[in-house]
Amino acid sequence: MIYRGRRMKIQNDIKLLLNPEIFSNLIKCVENAFPNEACGLIFGNILEVANEQKEEDYYYHYICRKFRCLSPDKSSSVSFLIQNEELLHDIIINETEVNPNNKEMRLIGIFHSHPKGTSPSFTDMDQMKYLDYFSSIEHDYGNKAFKNLIWVIMDAVNNDINGYIYFEREIQQVNILSRKN
């Protein structure tokens, strides 16, 4: 992918696996927010899968298990904003720790829509970098909750979807694959 004049690296070792039910929920979230940007959190597991072609090498499969559509603090057709860190923290704790069925899950992605296109905006890229930094400092909101998240961006018009991760100090595109439940 060429993005803003330079080629974006594709991270082939990381894949997001999305089942049809969650994909449908992403679309509903976008439809309900339109013409504004939709946003939400994706929870699931990260599986380390051995690379059979190369010894001591692994792939990382982000398996989507649950999607939570959120109402942004400020509605806009060009951005989404969630400022209430306590609410965000409570949602993450509830989805990953409180519910006994979710003990193995963690936050694996941040979802939002764009009115047109699936490329990250400059604001998206700044937020990816900030959340990576936020994961490295001491605070009350789960230090590693925002590390290595996949940002999933959906085109609000045609429902195309792309994923991105801030990894090895750069924004990289990840493949999103469909999977059965």
Identify the meaning behind each predicted range.
Residues 2-107, 115-181:
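Conserved beta-strand-loop surface patch within small alpha/beta domains used
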